[in-house]
Amino acid sequence: MNNRIGDNLFHFGANEELLRALLEEGVKLVVIGGLAIAWHCPERQADDMDLLVEPTVENSARIAKTLTKLQIAGFSSTSFSKPGLQIPLKHIYYAELLTPQQEAPSFSEVEAKAVDAKLFNLPIRLASISTLIGMKKRAIQSATEQLEKHAKDIELLEKISS
């Protein structure tokens, strides 16, 4: 099943409630990840809904207010104002809220390149192809560094286990 039908994306049904509530509260966000890729490449089946949110105190307060209305507790008005956050909302929704990594393009840069799209027939901003390529390249680099670190750890442990 494709996530894109015409000029509209569809996804896990409960995510519509989350997205609608965030947009109604005026949360600044850009759809990223597999769902954004599915917009550009309809053959791509998306997994969860990844939303990049602007990491400002004002936007963070709007996010916290929205989550409280949706019965998701534990977030303060500054919870989403830090870089590099990845907050899964997987108990009720199949989504994650993320803030840009320190070394990655800022929210403003991602938003400036974003394209207009629809998700659940709601107007949204969606990451551009060039932004998504950059994000995927950073993910590969990070994974490669982690693999190298683990390989070195195994090598060190094997030396002392002989």
Q: Model segments located where?
A:
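Compositionally biased terminal segments of proteins
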Residues: M1-S162
